[in-house]
Amino acid sequence: RAGIVPDIVVLSKSIGGYGLPLALTLVNPAIDCFTPGEHNGTFRGNQLSFIAAKAGLEYMLENKVEKQVQEKAPIVKEFIEKEILPLDSRLKLRGIGLIWGIDCSEFPDKNFSDKVTRKAFDHKLIIELAGRDNSVVKLMPPLVIDKETLIEGLKALKAAFEDCLKELN
């Protein structure tokens, strides 16, 4: 998609499935100089993590999670573009799939994004901040979220932005 062809890719965290630790290093065969088992660390062979990762992959394949994400991603993008961004021209959107960020860095109040997360919590939505100076409101719902719950969360996010923008005026 971005035209990047890496020599090395490091994957970790949720790749283990069900919250168990697991990390992988993928190396382009053209530069791989290790023999199997030669490149390892002090925490190797966590069989429980391998089993959990396998179960997670099987779940994703059986439940067509990638297809679900492709169906829900436009819902999120369109909602934010049509319902949230028009609230204020200083809001900027970036993201892909079900990982989105609403950049609030153009607001003079450098705590604006933090206020949005607090208001979202009042609307029963837990969201986090990201980006430089925590100026980006991060939306990252579960990949398996149902559409009704997703839309409910998006409406809560919009309400949080509306509340914070009213307080500015």
What are these regions (language model features)?
Residues 1-169:
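Conserved N-terminal phosphate-binding loop of PLP-dependent enzymes in the Aspartate aminotransferase
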